[in-house]
Structures are given as C-alpha cells and as structure tokens.
Amino acid sequence: MTISRTPKFSAGELNVYSAPADVAAVTRALRTAGRRIVLVPTMGALHEGHLTLVRAAKRTPGAVVVVSIFVNPLQFGPNEDLNAYPRTLEDDLTALRAEGVEIVFTPTGSDMYPDGTRTSVHPGPLGDDLEGSSRPGHFAGVLTVVLKLFSIVRPDRAYFGEKDYQQLTLLRQMVADLNVDVQIVGVPTVRESDGLALSSRNRYLDKDQREQAGALSAALLAGKYAAAGGAEAALDAARAVLDEVPALEVDYLQVRDPMLGPAPAEGQARLLVAARLGRTRLIDNIAIDVGASAGIDGHPRVGNDQNHELPWRN
C-alpha cells in the first residue's frame, strides 16, 4: 500500500513546487490548518505591477500567498512568439522571496496539459471583442489556465491587475457563470511617473518609443477630463492626443460600460485603448464618469468610489 505524504512546506520561507499534485496537497493542508489561500497568477518576468498584486494579496488576514509562474501556450496566437516571451525565473524568485511570498507554483506545459488541450473554457461574445478581435483564442486560453489554477490551488481569492481590464471582466464573468467559489479582486494599474502602465512588454520599447508610449496614458487622462461632455467628447479628446504621435498605430479606442457593454449615455464607464509602437502592442484603460455624473465643474468625480483610480498627474 502506498501512503501519500504532504510535500514539505517551511513556513516563512519561499517554497517552490512544480507538480500540480504537490502544490494542491500543500494548500489543502494549509486550509485544513485554518489558513486562507490567495493566488496571484502570473507568466513571470515580474515587475512592480506584479509585486503590487502580491502586496495586496498579503494584506488578506491569515493568508498564505501562492504566486504561479507559467507562460501559458494557450493564450498565444499563431502570430505571437511564445518562445520570445521573457523568462526570468531566478530574478522572479528573488523578488518574491523579498516580498515574503511562501509558495511559488512553477509548472511546465506538460504538467498543466498532460493530455493536451481537450477541454477549454469558452469566453462567449466578449472574448471575441476588443482584444479578442485581434487575438482570436486568447481569452479562451486565459480562462482555461486560470480555471485550472483555481482547481489546483483552491484559493479563496485571486488577484489581477486592472490594466488587463477585459481579462478581469471575463474572469469575473467566468466565476459567476460557472459558480466558481473564488473572489476575483482587481487591483488598480501601476504606472511609471509619466503615466505609462507597467507591462512586461515595455522592455521591448526603444528610447524613442518609450517616450512616445506616454501618449496612451495622456490620451486616457484627456478623455477622463472631457467625459462630462459625453462618451464622444471623451473619445475626441483622447484621439486628439493620440493623433499627435504618428508612430502610434491605434488598434481601438472605445468607451464601454463597466462590464464592457455599450457605452452609457451617463454614469460610470471605461475608456480603453490599444496601439502598436513598432512591433510592440500596448494596452491601457481608465475609469471615467460620462455625462451628468461628472462634476459640475467638468472634472471627474473624486470620492470613495473604489472602482475609480485617481488621475496620476495634474
């Protein structure tokens, strides 16, 4: 008879597991001991944005933070180079150790998909919109791997950045539609001093492109302040900023409601942009208030609304 034993776990230290069965056994034992499991899924190449998610997760009382590092092949399209995605595992582990993370899950493709990809999660119509229109199959790959991570780790909460707002919305849709008992927590976008959203892709920008990339966040901020005049006013203001940078090839610039349905005539909304600089594709978004819900002075409302981040510059 084979007696299964829980893999070793050292509290207060960084524990790295690659086998799904091992991390599942450890998190199950921790839950039995009364600890809460919180998950931060990543593809590695960690930057301050990822570490902000980790810090938010660590604020959960009684939590053990699990960070997964897995470059998921399912979310790469035929024209996207999976092999070119940056892999910096040793640097990532050093950063996570400094943050006090106790569990890192680093599976391989064969660990996650031992029998191939026979089953996947269909994201519905929203999965083919916005990002999905230029990256077919991307969100099916994202939802499939995240659902697998949920099944393996069994977290109480999972933390995701608002920079990938469509992804965040689809994950909330998935857990609601499939009755997945995990709370999805969105964390505001982390930005450079000029407003550029942190992204692993920023490393591909040369000096000139890095300067030009600041136009995305500037356009969003212009749209935010113009939104009192309606969705079209927000788009016009944002477009005027983007047009000043001919090197930017804009894929889309849209206003949507918070669940990414059609733009509202009035109320809370999201302004989203995607553009290319050379071979690098960048995305960003910002919460806006459309129409009469904006302040009477024409500036966006600022208050206790947890869905809205403050402007990052005046």
From Swiss-Prot:
Gene Ontology terms, MF aspect: ATP binding; pantoate-beta-alanine ligase activity
Enzyme Commission code: 6.3.2.1
SUPFAM superfamilies recorded: Nucleotidylyl transferase
Source superkingdom: Bacteria
Reactions listed under catalytic activity: (R)-pantoate + beta-alanine + ATP = (R)-pantothenate + AMP + diphosphate + H(+)
This protein's pathway: Cofactor biosynthesis; (R)-pantothenate biosynthesis; (R)-pantothenate from (R)-pantoate and beta-alanine: step 1/1
Binding site for (R)-pantoate: 75, 167
Subcellular localization(s) per the UniProt record: Cytoplasm
Binding site for ATP: 43-50, 161-164, 190, 198-201
Disordered: region residues: 112-131
Binding site for beta-alanine: 75
InterPro entries the record matches: Pantoate_ligase, Pantoate_ligase_C, Rossmann-like_a/b/a_fold
Residues at the catalytic site: 50
Family: Belongs to the pantothenate synthetase family.
Further remark: The reaction proceeds by a bi uni uni bi ping pong mechanism.
Subunit structure: Homodimer.
Main function: Catalyzes the condensation of pantoate with beta-alanine in an ATP-dependent reaction via a pantoyl-adenylate intermediate.
Protein name: Pantothenate synthetase
Organism: Mycolicibacterium smegmatis (strain ATCC 700084 / mc(2)155) (Mycobacterium smegmatis)
